[in-house]
From Swiss-Prot:
Record organism: Clostridium acetobutylicum (strain ATCC 824 / DSM 792 / JCM 1419 / IAM 19013 / LMG 5710 / NBRC 13948 / NRRL B-527 / VKM B-1787 / 2291 / W)
Protein's name in the database: Aspartate carbamoyltransferase regulatory chain
Metal-binding keyword on record: yes
Binding, Zn(2+): 102, 107, 131, 134
Keywords, ordered alphabetically: Metal-binding, Pyrimidine biosynthesis, Zinc
Length: 146
């Protein structure tokens, strides 16, 4: 059995769907980080057969809306002095800005690059978002192709 050490201070992104941890790790550009990170894949899970986990040492600035958009079943644990100080259960954010890019060629964001890409959650069950400008529908993180 593999033993993974705890972190003293930082963030643990837990309950990532098995096999998706590397996609989130890459999306967050953690491979380029100048602080310690760890990606654990196919860890044993009580809820499911397996899960992925990402540990980030000494970093507290993380966009939870992006993580909730990528995988709404993630739990973020805030670690201080090697203890879990806070558990945050993520969910789909009600709106996302500049995470999804609208691909509708008639959308104003295709022509005017300074306009932010804004999407509102329209169906939580299906994970569908609608562009605020052209009403194009996107299905959750699949729009990011991760």
């Amino acid at each position: 059995m593999l033993t993974i050490n705890s972190i003293k201070n930082g963030i643990v992104i837990d309950h990532i769907k098995a096999g998706h941890g590397i996609k989130i790790y890459n999306y967050l550009k953690l491979g380029e980080a100048e602080f310690p990170t760890a990606l654990i894949m196919n860890a044993i899970s009580k809820k499911n057969k397996a899960k992925d986990i990402i540990k980030i040492e000494n970093v507290m600035d993380l966009d939870l809306a992006v993580l909730g958009f990528l995988d709404p079943n993630i739990t973020v644990n805030i670690i201080e002095d090697e203890k879990i100080r806070q558990k945050i259960q993520l969910k789909l954010p009600s709106e996302v800005n500049n995470i999804i890019k609208c691909s509708n060629p008639r959308c104003v964001t295709s022509v005017e690059s300074y306009i932010p890409h804004k999407f509102k959650l329209v169906d939580e069950e299906k994970g569908e978002y609608k562009c605020e400008y052209c009403d194009e529908i996107y299905k959750g993180a699949k729009a990011l192709e991760i």
